[in-house]
């Protein structure tokens, strides 16, 4: 039986150790910090942000964030088996709505990955947008299904969907 390990640490440290040991994976599921850069006056929000990221500055410029994400994807490439897939869940912030698109473009231009599919996650418990009350509530988030460009032909995305879970 295959063993499954979970590590609660910076993904770059985990991937470095995996590379050193020659470990490979078939699937990467990643939901990185969204680079929201949003200030909050609420004590609860500040406590939650501090507990979520010990050392990550979630307020980079779009260019810094794109480079950081692209570096992570270049490391994904080193640990991903042939025909492996990345599920990348990312969203757009209220104050930096372009960050997601700038980073996605950087991945597509600076790595050998491509978007094979996109899943739209309808969040059942989407909260009202109290950070910027003049913006729409974020009720969906994309999950990009990403594979290597040269492996797209073997990406089997056309199987019949047998069931779809209702989330909202």
Model segments located where?
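Core catalytic lobe of class I
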Residues: 2-168
